[in-house]
UniProtKB/Swiss-Prot annotation:
Residues 307-330 have a biased composition (Low complexity). GO terms for biological process: cellulose catabolic process; xylan catabolic process. Belongs to the carbohydrate esterase 1 (CE1) family. AxeA subfamily. The lineage of its organism: Eukaryota, Fungi, Dikarya, Ascomycota, Pezizomycotina. The gene is axeA. This is Probable acetylxylan esterase A. The keyword Secreted applies.
Amino acid sequence: MRALSVFFALFCFLALSSASPGQDVVKRVTSGSLQQVTNFGSNPSGTLMYIYVPKNLATKPGIVVAIHYCTGTAQAYYTGSPYAQLAEQYGFIVIYPQSPYSGTCWDVSSQSALTHNGGGDSNSIANMVTWTISQYNADTSKVFVTGSSSGAMMTNVMAATYPELFAAATVYSGVSAGCFYSSSNQVDAWNSSCAQGNVISTPEVWGGIAKAMYPGYTGPRPRMQIYHGSTDTTLYPQNYYETCKQWAGVFGYNYNSPQSTQSNTPQANYQTTIWGPNLQGIFATGVGHTVPIHGEQDMEWFGFAGGSSTTTTQPTTTSTTTSSGGSSTGTGVAAHWGQCGGNGWTGPTVCASGYTCTVVNAWYSQCL
């Protein structure tokens, strides 16, 4: 009998030892607590991964990627945001990435971070998502991303570089994707001009910058909800308008003609502007940096609670017969304001007479 017990113990040991590394990590993740995952796949930037698996895990769970602010950590965002508690209510998994840099801001400045599969922080975070989908049989139609401050910047970048992964995003006091771009390709660089609201452009330019981060992609893009405060002196309020311009440009909405504007929504002194089903902007009067997380509104936007669908739609394609919108002349020559170059650009590279192809950044050149 004793020999049989020893044999059984040895059998169990060998069975556990033969489990794949990924399976072993899942076994070690304790439901209801923040846990680190170290072997989620390729991690080119050395970003840390923490995960919260709720005790009330859905059979086919959704995923929320929650990205911290400068000076923050995964632990700080876990304790300071409502997503873990909401995960218990709705059964989704929360991924908390942690910046590898001193000061723990996110790299939203280097070309690697601003390019699909470019090898930066965005690449590492995307690999966390695909690992979690695989290990937990997650619902790929219910994957979302959110963040505050620097994490909000990265949220915009994730939506631009990996649109195929996310159904929707909420952005709390960030800047548009590419606004912090470093012309010297510096990793984790600060851009004072952008932060102070001095980088101003058109929806067409901003939208082109976002699209160029994943050249050739034509699939659905995440619905975007943008929050910003009117008294923000870290990332000035102009960044709200530029971010809304960017996503209006991506989705083909007329930025200057929103569908509706709602005062005191979702609360007093907040104004919600709706351009279409894929874009809402929420401007908080009297609020600084950052706008507090509105967890229940996030759940509605993500479709876990009543109020919003998680369905994404193809970007709207608009056309014009004039050159004022920056469209191609159709003869291989770009009109005034039209795109004429940038990473991944396959359209005309020559401007109409009287205009010069001017480099805005690595992803976008424009006829000016």
